């Protein structure tokens, strides 16, 4: 049986180009959509672990950040905060110099990740009012810390003093960088009330902090890259409370 000529197949309007669909490899199908510098490593980064090849399951990225040395150290900040409409700031890179598992050995260390755990809640007098209150959280890197941490209104520019529209001021964008941003909402009232909201956030940030020669864990002893957590609620007259446990996981630098 003779085959059809190749030119007839191409010129026929009803003919379609048959392709072999391969759903196993996102790297081969990445050529269909033009992307910027698609590497084989990046194509598998957003896949679940059971769908990755064996090579990407066994050989993972190193746990210790570049330029640092183990072991992984932990520092916790546990406090109840009164979050107001004007905002509040908390320094989460205060680490004392020492030899323990919660201390820094020298001036430099790298905060690899941060874990924010807790809840926001209202007291009994406020939760009976019909309102909705959202707490905005901003994890900010202060590249050039000096003196005391700046207030929320000094760093962020807001429209009509509304924290939900907060962006870093134009003259502050070089010194203050928002690393992560999230929010949590509580609702008060007699019906359909939600008096508390759980906060469970884990982020990899790789923030390289630098201290001066002082040993105390203070903001004023930072010289580079202090880590600040800004909080502000959207309701002007009804405050909200935040009970948080913040843990940072850091490694000492080999330059110490």
From Swiss-Prot:
Compartments where found: Virion; Host nucleus
Zinc finger regions, unnamed: 68-85
Chain span(s) of sequence motif Bipartite nuclear localization signal: 3-20, 200-247
GO BP: symbiont entry into host cell; viral penetration into host nucleus
Molecular function (Gene Ontology), one example: DNA binding
Pfam families, per database record: Gemini_coat
Main location: virion
Motif window: Nuclear localization signal: 40-54
Superkingdom assignment: Viruses
Sequence motif: Nuclear export signal, positions: 101-122
Record's keyword terms, sorted: Capsid protein, DNA-binding, Host nucleus, Metal-binding, T=1 icosahedral capsid protein, Viral penetration into host nucleus, Virion, Virus entry into host cell, Zinc, Zinc-finger
InterPro entries: Gem_coat_AR1 (IPR000650), GV_A/BR1_coat (IPR000263), Viral_coat (IPR029053)
Function comment: Encapsidates the viral genome into characteristic twinned ('geminate') particles. Binds the genomic viral ssDNA and shuttles it into and out of the cell nucleus. Plays a role in protection of the genome from degradation, virus acquisition and transmission by insect vectors, infectivity, and systemic movement. The CP of monopartite geminiviruses is absolutely essential for virus movement.
Family: Belongs to the geminiviridae capsid protein family.
Listed name of the protein: Capsid protein
Organism from which the protein derives: Tomato leaf curl virus (strain Australia)
Lineage summary: Viruses, Monodnaviria, Shotokuvirae, Cressdnaviricota, Repensiviricetes
